[in-house]
Amino acid sequence: MTARLPKVLAEYFAATNAHDVGAMIAAFTEGATVHDEGRDHVGVTAIRAWMTETIDKYDYQVEPIESARDGSRAVVLVSLRGRFPGSPITLQYAFTLSGEKVARLEIGG
C-alpha cells in the first residue's frame, strides 16, 4: 500500500531515501524537535547532526506504508531497512506540522 502524504512529508521521505540532508532539513522549522531512540534533537543544527549520524550509522531507506492525518498531526507507519539488526522493521513517525513545515517528529516502534 502506498501512503498518501502531505507534500512536505513526501518530500522529506524522498530526501531521506536520497540521503540528501539539505533537502531533509528543509522540511523542518528552525526550532523543530526530533525525538528518536530516547533523545531529543532541538533546532535545525541538532537535527542536521542527528540526520548525518543516523545515515552514516544505519545507511537506511524508508518506505511509508500508511498514514493518517488529524489537523496538524500526521502519523505515518513506515518500513525501515538498513544496516541494523532485525532489518527491516516497522516504525511509526508522528509529525506535528506548522504550516508547510515539520515542527516535531517522534519516531517509535
Regions found by a protein language model. Give the residues of each.
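Short, low-complexity N-terminal intrinsically disordered segments enriched in polar/charged residues
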Residues: 1-26
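Hydrophobic/anchoring residues in structured secondary elements
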Residues: 34, 67-69, 107
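Short beta-edge strand/loop motif at the mouth of beta-sheet-based domains
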Residues: 41-49
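Short beta-strand edge/turn micro-motifs at domain boundaries
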Residues: 90-109
